[in-house]
Swiss-Prot record:
PANTHER family: DUF211 DOMAIN-CONTAINING PROTEIN
Source species of the chain: Methanocaldococcus jannaschii (strain ATCC 43067 / DSM 2661 / JAL-1 / JCM 10045 / NBRC 100440)
Coiled coil region boundaries: none
Protein name: Uncharacterized protein MJ0319
Taxonomic placement: Archaea, Methanobacteriati, Methanobacteriota, Methanomada group, Methanococci
Superkingdom per UniProt: Archaea
A Pfam family annotated for this UniProt entry: DUF211
Length: 97
């Protein structure tokens, strides 16, 4: 099975649990090979984090359930990669600023 191989999420979460705990909880799910969490904004009570998850045949509903059980809210799905292999994004002339 191929299914979803990478998903990138923008998440708002409370300061607790720590991102280390969130990463370990997510990696306990089946089919997840790795998790990368980056904090890009901190407010008084919350953190905005970018979560990149890679694996094979990822179950978005399971991932969302874990995030919500830890007090997180998914703001957006910023990238999804599916299929037999991961295709990296290619820059085009439209991407220039």
């Amino acid at each position: 099975m191929n299914g979803i191989r990478r998903i990138v999420l923008d998440i708002l979460k409370p300061h607790e649990p720590k991102i280390t705990d969130m990463a370990l909880k997510l990696t306990s799910l089946s089919n997840i090979d790795g998790v990368n969490i980056t904090v890009y904004e901190i407010d008084k009570e919350t953190e905005n984090v970018k979560v990149t998850i890679e694996g094979n045949n990822l179950d978005f509903d399971e991932i969302q359930e874990i995030i919500e059980s830890l007090g997180g809210t998914i703001h957006s799905i910023d990238e999804v990669v599916a299929g037999k292999k991961i295709i990296e994004e290619v820059r085009t002339p439209q991407d220039r600023h």
